[in-house]
């Protein structure tokens, strides 16, 4: 087989492989909220890979061997009372908009200078 036909054959095979691969799901911004508690009676199916796969405000949640789009919960606890006479020290900037933007169990709460920060909740 001539070299030009062999090159064309290899190029065609590579193109066929690339077209046969599934599209890569975007890693869109994470949606607000916290996934609800795991329900016991679920089949092992994958409805989503990331929040971008879910409609509206639904969040892609892992529940055992399942990933499903669910309405998220807020994080537990409530925001601590802010003493206006003694506002928090530090930068007076918005650090978050919703609880899910805060690490761990921290909540997004008013910080005393008209902005919001990730703070330890009151239980």
UniProtKB/Swiss-Prot annotation:
PANTHER family: WAP FOUR-DISULFIDE CORE DOMAIN PROTEIN 2, WHEY ACDIC PROTEIN WAP. This is WAP four-disulfide core domain protein 2. Disulfide bonds join 35-61, 44-65, 48-60, 54-69, 79-109, 92-113, 96-108, 102-118. Keywords: Aspartic protease inhibitor, Disulfide bond, Protease inhibitor, Repeat, Secreted, Serine protease inhibitor, Signal, Thiol protease inhibitor. The lineage of its organism: Eukaryota, Metazoa, Chordata, Craniata, Vertebrata. GO terms for biological process: antibacterial humoral response; innate immune response. The gene is WFDC2. InterPro entries: Elafin-like_sf, WAP_dom, WAP_four-disulfide_core. Homotrimer; disulfide-linked. Residues 1-26 form the signal peptide.
């Amino acid at each position: 087989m001539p070299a030009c036909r062999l090159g064309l054959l290899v190029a065609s095979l590579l193109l066929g492989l690339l077209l046969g691969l599934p599209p890569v799901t975007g890693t869109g911004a994470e949606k607000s909220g916290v996934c609800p508690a795991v329900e016991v009676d679920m089949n092992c199916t994958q409805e989503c890979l990331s929040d971008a796969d879910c409609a509206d405000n639904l969040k892609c949640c892992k529940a055992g061997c399942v990933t499903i789009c669910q309405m998220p919960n807020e994080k537990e606890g409530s925001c601590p009372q802010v003493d206006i006479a003694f506002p928090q020290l530090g930068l007076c900037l918005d650090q978050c908009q919703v609880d899910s933007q805060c690490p761990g169990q921290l909540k997004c709460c008013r910080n005393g200078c008209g902005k919001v920060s990730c703070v330890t909740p009151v239980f």
